[in-house]
Amino acid sequence: MTISTTSSSTSSKTSSEKGDDLKGFSSSSSPASSRSSSATTPEPSSPTVLAAKTIESIDPFQPRKDYNENVLPAIPATEAVQPLTSDANTPDHWIARDERMIRLTGKHPFNSEAPLSELFSKGFLTPQNLFYVRSHGDTPRVTREQAENWKLKVHGLVEQEVELSIKDLKEKFPTVTLPITLVCAGNRRKEQNMVAKGLGFNWGAAGVSTGLFTGVYLADILDYCKPKNPLLSSFPSYDVAVPGRARHVVFEGADELPKGKYGTSQRLNWALDRCKGMLIAWGLNGEDLSPDHGYPLRLVVPGQIGGRMVKWLERIEVSDRESQHHLHFHDNKVLPTEVTADQARSEMHWWYDPKYIINDLNVNAAICSPDHDQVVNVAEPSTSSPQMLPLEGYAYTGGGRRIHRVEISLDDGHSWKCASIHYPEDLYRMYPIQGHEYFGTLDLSATEMSFSWCFWRLDVDVQADIIAKDVKVISVRALDEGLATMPRDMYWNATSMMNSWWFRVAVHREGENGNQIRFEHPTLAGNAPGGWMQRMNEAGLNPRYPQFGEAKAVESCKTDANTLAAAKEAKVDPKAIMIDPSKADTIITAADLAAHGDGEGPEPWFVVHGHVYDGTGFLKDHPGGDQSIRLVAGEDATEDFMAIHSMDAKKMLRDFHLGRLEKQDAAPPAATTEGEVLDLSKPFLDPKKWRATRLVSKQIISPDARIFRFALGSEDQELGLPVGQHVFVRVRSKNARTGETEMVQRAYTPYSGNTQRGFLDILIKVYFPSDAAATSAPAFEGGKMTMLLEKIDVSSPSDDLTIELKGPLGSFTYLGQQQIRWKPASAVRRVRKLAMIAGGSGITPIWSTLKAIADEVLDASNPSSPALDPIQIWIVYGNRTEQDILIREELERLRVALKGNLKVWHVLSNCTPENEANWSMGRGHITANVLRTHLPPPPAKPASEDELEDTLALVCGPPPMEKAVSDGLKQLGWDLQRCVVFF
């Protein structure tokens, strides 16, 4: 971006100053009613905001019942957001989110931060939609009715165990609101990962947000329950349990993770101290908590890292020992810098030392303006009106301490200037609120504790301070009231947490005659390339000890090789450690990859650096859940995998290596050419030749499902695809950036039958990309094939894109008249009963067979067909929610038309009595009992090997479902090899 800065005489207030002084607040905005949130707590109520008045009429230091935005920071309402297509195929598909948020761990789980400039522009209070999000798995889906009945259990070493609803909390204890800054311990982590990759993903400098949290003091709840025999001393060490002595308070949330629920703990003596400000909160900025931020109830611990603040809070236990939850030990630690990432993975003793745990935040600051890659046009020198450039940013610290000093250096730390500091939270000391209908007490006048960030600013003369002094870097550091400061040198650690070295922005003279200045931040959040640290790495320099400009080496910054090696991972080629040497020459064809490209199929394969890997064996153990693997099935996952995973994870990939993906020739294999005349009297498809087609229409079935229609050679041409078989679709497109032709190929089962002429319809789930920030690439670019099809303008064909079809392929075929060709040896059998079990998009191959059978029964135009008893068909179809059921109406129409010969049973895994009161079918998962109740019994064992059973089961769905179905069918007596077809 390019801006022109103002002169000192006309300098206007910047966005970061909104709410920073007594006259800089807008009275135009007010918080949205909590009724507008997607889910509400039992007593929705918006804060009352007074109409504009003159500031002179408002008495400071006098408690009031109203929130007055004339003198207090404007409360930001959650901005208009909706569920995103990038979440459509994840368990979080129902959550409304802001498309501007930068995703740090691919599509799922949702870990994100706002673009730094967007965050800073919002001022002191951050709207919920731009609040950073840290989640370890699926977000619990809590309905309003469930929230009204939500119970917080308080138990353990207490005189009185209780279960409290949110209504109970409001009635039993005083309501309190505090302005609190939340910070992820990984804030600014990517800077450490640019030195040596640690165990965590790439947070930028916007893993911080501030809001008004409303709830009750944790101390009030503990006083009510009365801890037994409390031990408040620091001796013995906190990792030593003293039986029967209440010493720790353990918190547990509702989120289910691979290694148990998320939980952590606080020392009892801290939890009993109201000065610590620990809240059990239900509100944020006058609204209910959003799902991503813990709806309906969470713990908030001012001055500590976000990892101590349990969301979706269900349980509080007073205990004689600290939390025993997995992530209480294996996360949120700053290990000694000598411990490499690999050591941290393999040497467990490091994680259990209480001296390495992170509680309080450390002092930190960042430059938010100028933004990364921002360009300032340099004005002609003027003595009367110098061109001024405001340097601005945030600073914070922990433990209730206050930032006392922010300093700026324009010469890499040789000299420093103090910036002015604005403390918006002090307005809640000058204008306290008591007895507010929503906030209760919002009054900092009785405490010196500081729980919020502050903003700093220093105006510099562009000519005198930047140009004349040939400034190469701008640095910022902050000091708190304990004189703790930000160090010059990075303290690298295996978790890459609590990074707080100087925040440096490189300065570049550009343009004709150097009439422009461009600013370069150290990194960009997530997987986005850019920043001076990456540039130094690529130049062979060490960004841990950066040198800006000429002759800027500082001897005291240097270190010996042994010290540096102890803090960095060994320089190894990550590509080499991911490859099994015995399979390095094994060639995997594009067709093989395409056959395993269904994210809900039994064996999802993916590509990293041109090699193919089978993710099946790691679906159950993947820390981010199996969705993270399924979402890249059949795709090139290089960017996401390399950016997120540690060297140890890259080594693990070798166990799943299959071989090298075949290279695609620049010229296409044999396909329809200009010189070839297509015989329209023959079927369109050819198993040995690609046939050119075009996309002629797209029918939207759901937010992430489409029926794509492809034209054949003529309106009367037959497709030539037997029922139950698949077709290859290949798309060639020209890369606008490189000019090269790229190819994507997938196998699909058609939605339309072979009787349809002139067209081929395919029902496809579209994998949409995650959204990018203004200058960053998306964490997930979407399904290559599905996004190519989605973006095609059917009304305006492009010469840069071609679509081709080839087929058929597959081992199962319905021949008609109750005849099926399948194994063994493509033998033909007559079937009388079919059990069809599908999950999600696995209904597609099931549908093609069902539709063909139904068409035969319902076709009255062919009286010569032999009269056969209709095939008896049972369908069990599993989905997450009712909205996820594909072709539901079509299934119902066939059920009615087939008059008792088709039975359909739907099973919803996310169906509960509260949100699906009218649902009359199955709930939960497809179990053996479901199969026993809603399918026919298995066929009798044939008298000889040559005799073929007349009953088959057809199965297609995600691997967990297929595994459960396999086990269930086997338990019920089905022969999986002879009688069960897995598509």
Swiss-Prot record:
Catalytic function, reaction form: nitrite + NADP(+) + H2O = nitrate + NADPH + H(+)
Residue positions binding NADP(+): L952, A953, L954, V955, C956, G957, P958, P959, P960, M961
Name recorded for this polypeptide: Nitrate reductase [NADPH]
GO annotation terms (biological process): nitrate assimilation
Biological source species: Mycosarcoma maydis
Keyword DNA damage: no
Biased composition (Low complexity): 1-14, 26-48
UniProt lineage: Eukaryota, Fungi, Dikarya, Basidiomycota, Ustilaginomycotina
Regions annotated as coiled coil: none
PANTHER family reported in the protein's UniProt record: SULFITE OXIDASE, MITOCHONDRIAL, SULFITE REDUCTASE
Entry's family note: Belongs to the nitrate reductase family.
Binding of Mo-molybdopterin, residues: C184
